[in-house]
Amino acid sequence: MRKLIAAINMTLDGFCDHTAMIADEEIHQHYNELLSNAGTLIYGRITYQLMESYWPSVVKNPTGNKPRDEFAVLIDNISKIVFSRTLKNVDWKNTKLKKEVIKEEVLELKQQAGKNILVGSPSLIVALTQLDLIDEYQLGLQPIVLGSGLPLFKNVKDRINLKLLKTKTFGCGAVTLYYEPTKK
């Protein structure tokens, strides 16, 4: 059974903002390893459009930064599923469009052979958390305080107890916390 891993960066005060992160070589290498061990990425519309608007262009025109360019190739080649009620089509290669999150479909995806499944969209992390489908949370805490923004767990309705599996620290001051939900 494949694990469904919620992997996302957030500020120390709990907000998700792609501009509020340190994207140095060490962080990119970390995410390259994460993508190398994944077989599928799941996105919501907003995160999909953000990623799709940038990474394919890096594949075509590499930056010269080895970890960043490697990340671009990895994310370009991985299988992607986008959940959106408003998108009519998706143009990024290896991408399928689904209209809504259906628990049985996600469970079926987890049962398939292959590498782990990653989700990195705040709204989808909440939806999949509500459906009790997340096997592991990898929360990349950035050494930044925003004071406002999109809080990751704002719409989670029920308490979720987590067990700390490990931590990983980075030279820039970021820390990734690895958690798994404990049984209720």
Over which residues does each language-model region extend?
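Enzymes that bind and transform nitrogen-containing heteroaromatic metabolites
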Residues: M1-K184
